[in-house]
Curated annotation (Swiss-Prot):
Low complexity biased stretches: 409-422
Zn finger (RanBP2-type) location: 662-692
Pfam families given in the database record: CUE
The protein's name in its UniProt record: Mitogen-activated protein kinase kinase kinase 7-interacting protein 3 homolog
Positions in coiled-coil regions: 496-580
Functional description taken from the UniProt entry: May play a role in signaling pathway.
Gene name as annotated: map3k7ip3
UniProt cross-references to CDD domains, sorted A to Z: CUE_TAB2_TAB3 (cd14362)
Keyword Coiled coil: yes
Molecular functions (GO terms): ubiquitin binding; zinc ion binding
Compositional bias per record (Basic and acidic residues), positions renumbered to this chain: 608-620
Length: 692
């Protein structure tokens, strides 16, 4: 392998492989070898290669046989030196993109290998510009305008949007390649009759064969291969046409733009149609030509009888100023089965562009403003009543560029109506002239999918794909018939609409879920508030019922009166002590608070002397007389514990009394009234100083 070479940097290879996972490792290593492991050069080269692998535009034969949904047919001008009939890789010009979902065309079995099968993306158009937003929305979720055009480049230097994604083996043509998309829809039974346009002069190096097929009648747009009307296997061999077209007999000069030279365009005559055979039989087709003039050597147009109601085409096509009108002629059962006597293809030049249209059937932006000579063609044969079309009965010129103007001319001797209708009586003796006029169409807004004149707000809803066109008679529901066009424009537009609607559905579902959660939260909050209200009501009811009885009220009134008496006695005692003066008070005499406490190890012993105890007993007697003048029951209670408490303490602590006399008397704190040891200078409880 290439990555095993010594000059390859494995770290750079891994970085590039991680940056571009869609590109195979051998391709990345080969790119590194070609660029001498230059990271910038490899990054630029792999960025260009990444588009091909992301959108599957590389030419893989095995995958092409299985996954091909598009038919690229190169049309246009290419130098004779690079034109080889046996190698499809050397064919240059304008690639023709055609949907071939119902079957498969094997490019290896075609005589000239002029078919390049490219798988079609499932969610994007076949040709997408670099600055194109496929969801039709900008950041503000509005219909975004047409993307700004790129700067104008030289005709021989710039490449189109499709060329940027073409395989590397494709030679860049001298003239800009313009994509052509052919979209056909089945509208009738398959009849093995084809219209062939074959020139009469040989060896034209500027021609390219065109092979156009179209899905079967039963196909609703995208089907599997078991419903195809022709063999999907590689055994489906194309008829052998001459890939080298002859030089034309007559020329008609045409000029499309100031930067483009006049290239001759010829008028062709076709041999009898019965002489050409085709393995494909498909209904009504519509071919489109591009604005870059070129020689078309073979045009394979297989029309068949159409079952479309005549009223779909009875309305005259809308006139456009300074150009031909666009008309559709379905092949009816009354048309001539014999050969077409004359087929004329003319190219008209337009002097002044027409008014700007306001609709586009496809979301593809081909950047037509890059070069003045580039005018991509994008014409669809989808029914006008298709959901992607806004006007039910009026076909209009589509994408900016050169639409295909098909005009059917019948001699006046024919008994049929000369107006475009599906029922035209013809006979083999009457010569028929089938004219194909190609002219320039006015530029239109690319992203205006909805017709402004009829549907200014919302597009018509997408009908189910299973609604196929039915035979005549149902004139009232033809507007809702889903066209079974399998072109990339309808498919990409439908997929984009479905994606957009799916996103809207998900967003609405998310909003609905959020609203449901909000509703549940509000319900829970309301339930909680109701519960609190009920609890308050219950408490209020219980409080009103718990009224005390008269006996309880009498007891409470007696307790309240007793408490008031005790408060009054305490207040009078305080007043009496204040009247005697705080300086005369003996701290030891007021130590009855500590005497009434239960004895414990932390409580200091009582150090009152006998004389002090006598003085204290006298003061207590006087206080008891003054306080208990109103309450007669208190003196026995107060006298008994005091006499009982003082006696035992004085008898039980003779030795601690001597020790304390030796150390000094304890002092009482003025702030907390705590009796402290005489050796302490600060209160043991509140840390207040002894002498203030």
């Amino acid at each position: 392998m290439a990555q095993s070479s010594p000059q390859l940097d494995i770290q750079v290879l891994n970085d590039l492989q991680q940056r571009f996972p869609e590109i195979p490792r051998d391709v990345v290593s080969q790119c590194m070898l070609q660029n001498n492991s230059n990271l910038d050069a490899c990054y630029r080269a792999l960025t260009q290669e990444s588009c091909k692998y992301l959108y599957m535009d590389y030419h893989n034969l095995d995958e092409t046989r299985m996954n091909s949904n598009l038919l690229h047919i190169n049309l246009g001008i290419h130098p004779s030196s690079t034109y080889h009939t046996g190698d499809g890789a050397q064919v240059n010009g304008r690639p023709l993109v055609h949907s071939s979902s119902d079957g498969h065309i094997d490019p290896q079995r075609s005589p000239g290998k002029l078919l390049c099968l490219v798988p079609e993306p499932q969610s994007a158009p076949a040709v997408v510009a670099q600055n194109y937003n496929q969801f039709f929305l900008n950041d503000q979720n509005r219909n975004s305008p047409t993307p700004p055009p790129q700067p104008v480049q030289q005709p021989g230097v710039g490449t189109s949007a499709m060329q940027a994604s073409l395989p590397t083996y494709m030679h860049v043509p001298r003239y800009s390649a313009n994509p052509i998309t052919v979209t056909v829809s089945p509208s009738g039974h398959n009849v093995p009759r084809a219209l062939q346009i074959v020139p009469q002069v040989q060896n034209n190096p500027y021609g390219t064969p065109i092979y156009i097929r179209h899905p079967s009648q039963n196909s609703p747009g995208r089907q599997t291969q078991q419903n195809t009307a022709w063999p999907p296997s590689p055994q489906a061999v194309l008829p052998h046409y001459n890939p080298c077209p002859p030089y034309p007999q007559s020329f008609q000069p045409t000029q499309y733009s100031p930067k483009q030279p006049q290239i001759p365009q010829s008028a062709f005559r076709s041999p009898p149609t019965s002489q050409c055979t085709s393995p494909y039989s498909s209904p009504q087709h519509q071919v489109q030509t591009n604005q870059l003039s070129h020689q078309t050597s073979h045009v394979f147009l297989p029309p068949s009888p159409s079952t479309v109601s005549p009223h779909l085409y009875q309305q005259a096509p809308p006139p456009y100023p300074k150009q031909s009108s666009l008309g559709y002629l379905p092949y009816g059962p009354g048309l001539n089965k014999g050969p077409m006597n004359k087929i004329e293809i003319t190219v008209e030049s337009q002097q002044r562009p027409g008014p700007t249209l306001n609709r586009s059937p496809s979301p593809i932006n081909n950047q037509s403003a890059q070069r003045s000579q580039q005018h991509p063609v994008y014409v669809s044969n989808a029914r006008s009543g298709s959901p992607s079309r806004g006007i039910p009965t009026q076909p209009k010129a589509s994408y900016s560029g050169s639409p295909l103007f098909i005009t059917y001319s019948q001699p006046p001797t024919t008994t049929g109506s000369p107006t475009p209708s599906s029922r035209v009586v013809m006979s083999p003796s009457n010569p028929t002239v089938f004219k194909i006029t190609v002219g320039r169409a006015p530029t239109e807004n690319l992203l205006n999918i909805v017709d402004q004149e009829q549907h200014p707000s919302t597009p018509e809803p997408i009908q189910p794909i299973s609604l196929l066109p039915v035979s005549g008679g149902d004139k009232g529901i033809h507007k809702y018939h889903r066209s079974s066009s399998s072109g990339s424009d309808d498919y990409a537009y439908t997929q984009a609409l479905l994606l957009h609607q799916r996103a809207r559905m998900e967003r609405l579902a998310k909003e609905l879920k959020h609203e449901k959660e909000e509703l549940e939260r509000l319900k829970a909050e309301v339930n909680g508030m109701e519960h609190d209200l009920m609890q308050r009501r219950l408490r209020r009811v219980s409080c009103t019922t718990a009224i005390p009885t008269p006996e309880e009220m009498t007891r409470l009134r007696g307790l309240n009166r007793q408490l008031q008496i005790n408060v009054d006695c305490t207040q009078k005692e305080i007043d009496l002590l204040q009247s005697r003066g705080m300086a005369k008070l003996d701290v030891k005499a007021m130590s009855n608070f500590y005497d009434n406490l239960s004895p414990g190890p932390a409580v200091p012993p009582n150090t009152c002397k006998k004389e002090s105890s006598e003085t204290t007993s006298g003061e207590r007697k006087a206080r008891r007389i003054s306080v208990t003048s109103k309450i007669k029951s208190d003196p026995p209670d107060l006298q008994a514990p005091s006499s009982l408490d003082i006696g035992p303490w004085q008898r039980a602590s003779p030795r601690p009394g001597r020790d304390e006399d030796f150390e000094g008397s304890p002092w009482n704190c003025n702030s907390c009234t705590f009796l402290n040891h005489p050796a302490l200078n600060r209160c043991e409880q509140c840390e207040m100083p002894r002498f203030t």
